[in-house]
Regions:
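Loop/helix patches that line or flank the sugar-binding groove of alpha-linked glycan CAZymes
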Residues: 1-131, 136-150
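Solvent-exposed beta-hairpin/edge-strand motifs
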Residues: 147-159
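C-terminal beta-strand-rich structural cap/linker in extracellular carbohydrate-active enzymes
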Residues: 166-185
Length: 185
């Protein structure tokens, strides 16, 4: 889970009144703001002598994901994404192929498609589109970005998800490392 707790393989730990189900809340710390959201508390675990504690970077990464979800309505939609027009004129989602072009039916049906991206249309006036890029392949993937200026909000190459400062703002091309995900605005 978000704190790296395996619960010793027990998926019914809710009924365990022992170390398997307990959380040590003394490790609560404030995680810096992300993408315009205000700072939020997060649990940095510490515990009993000899206890296996989660990686604090995982907790910070999860807090970053939560902050991004709170900040961007596109990441918490309550309806299916269909590609339909939105009330403000764009589309709710546009699926892109490896070259950064809209996917066609044939491409959807190709086996072995492990690198793609999609645009999540702005949910309200004044908001920006988001782009999610996923590379499930072992090799790096170079692709074109849609027109405009893009800022990297999340990069899973970094353990805490923070984008590398040198890659924070992009204009036309991007290289995505193998087995990684990036979120752009």
């Amino acid at each position: 889970d978000e704190m790296g707790r395996t619960q010793q393989g027990n998926n019914n730990a809710y009924c365990q009144d022992n170390e398997i189900g307990w959380l040590d809340w003394r490790g609560l710390v404030e995680v810096p703001a992300v993408g315009g959201a205000r700072a939020r508390p997060a649990l940095r675990m510490s515990g009993a002598e000899g206890a296996v504690m989660p990686d604090p970077t995982l907790v910070e990464f999860t807090a970053r994901l939560i902050a991004l979800r709170r900040r961007y309505p596109q990441l918490r939609r309550t309806t299916w994404l269909t590609g339909a027009a939105t009330a403000i004129g764009g589309r709710d989602v546009v699926w892109l192929n490896r070259q950064g072009e809209e996917m066609n039916r044939r491409q959807w049906e190709e086996w072995g498609r492990y690198a793609f991206s999609f645009l999540l249309g702005a949910a309200a006036p004044g908001e920006n589109d988001l782009m999610v890029m996923m590379n499930g392949e072992a090799s790096d993937w170079a692709t074109s970005l849609p027109p405009g200026r893009w800022q990297v909000l999340l990069d899973t190459v970094q353990a805490d998800g923070r984008p590398d400062e040198a890659m924070a703002v992009l204009q036309s091309r991007i290289v995505l490392k193998g087995r990684s995900l990036r979120l752009l605005e």
